[in-house]
Amino acid sequence: MQQIVILGGGAAGMAAALAAAQAAPAGAVRVTVLDRNPRCGKKLLATGNGRCNLSNTGIAPACYFTADPKALAPLLNAVNTAAPLEWFRALGLYTRTDEAGRVYPYSNQAADVLALLEGHMARLGVEVRTGCTVNTLSQNRNGYAVLFDSAERSNETLHADAVICAMGGNAGPQFGTDGFGTRFAAQCGGKLEPLYPCLTALQTARPNKALAGIRVKARAALLDLDRHTLLAEETGEVQFTDYGLSGICIMQLSGLLAPRRGPKRPAVELDLFPSLDEAALTALFAARVPLLPGRTPADFWTGLLNPKLGRALWAAARLPDTPLDTLPDAAWQVLANTAKHWLFEDLTPCGWKQAQTTGGGLSLTELEPSFQFRGCPGLYFVGETLDCAGMCGGFNLHWAFGSGITAGRDAVRTLRRPHKKR
């Protein structure tokens, strides 16, 4: 009996295993999953705050961060052709879509998605071995040999006619990921793009700890200070932290901070009043003074902004702490300009523990549209190991499930082709 071995039991690995088992002739192919955790899908359970944001109705190449957008196009087309949502519905999963296009299981439970995957894998005879650490992969004339340590013994060897590497990236080490997937890809001769934490909060050089926990609707723009250019902007909720800035729109911008191709001097500019232009905001500020019961800067923000945030903005504008009616008219233009262009410099992405996904990884140029490693029939790489990080909103799980399904199906189709060493 021929065998397909999947290295990693996360979203991509389970999708690959189940898709292969579905495509294989009955009794002809053994599908085996090796995972280092006590149970598959540990990280999946945490996605979408436990609700499992499966996909998005707005899937497009522009929603992914990669060093090679041209190489992404055929791979993303293959992922979309795999139709992960239709595949899940055929497994019995009913979904719902919110106003932002994010797709969730109707139950809002990531545990239900995992239970369906586990149940169908068991039904089709997929062997799942947990507590396994892969050491090496070698190629021979008959296929591949996987050397690994299991919970029972060290240096076990498993023969494989095809291998699908789904060992994840560096993000979320608390879920059992440690970057071995990308190191493994390099050991196989693959070109790696530099790794970086993606979809993460940003540290600033001089965080205002008094603002920690405050949330505000704002427009956040990522600037390249050296080139004086606007790189991207997002509108949404910004959260101030004791180390800097967070919130979904900040996390989206973090994807552009890739080594080598990202800005050398990035900065985030916040617009706290995105619905007003600067002239209208100046007029609003000036008109408030006679309306307020008090005449101090502390009174100024009542009913307008969180008072702590207002005090920080006042300080950023370098206005004196004097009665409001003593300030010149020009002060309101200065304050409005600061509120529309509040600059945060010296940015550093937070580490792997806070990152939702991994930027960089195995170059997409190394892959066929089937996710097969070029020059190595029967060897595939899928999911977060690859240089393709999606934005927040279900794009990463869509990529993980779709790449796994594509590779699993193709592995069955190519089993009888002769293996040639790269």
Feature map (PLM): residue ranges:
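Short hydrophobic core segments
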Residues: 5-7, 34, 134, 157-174, ...
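Beta1/beta-strand and adjacent pyrophosphate-binding region of the FAD-binding site
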Residues: 1-12, 32
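Glycine-rich loop(s) and the adjacent beta-strand/alpha-helix scaffold that form part
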Residues: 162-208
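A conserved short coil-to-beta-strand element within the FAD-binding core of flavoproteins
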Residues: 130-143
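A glycine-rich dinucleotide-binding beta-alpha-beta segment and adjacent secondary-structure elements
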Residues: 130, 310-389
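Glycine-rich FAD pyrophosphate-binding loop
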Residues: 21-49
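An anion/pyrophosphate-binding glycine-rich loop and adjacent beta-alpha core
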Residues: 38-40, 46, 54-61, 191-194, ...
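Glycine-rich active-site loop/strand segments that organize a redox cofactor
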Residues: 49-97
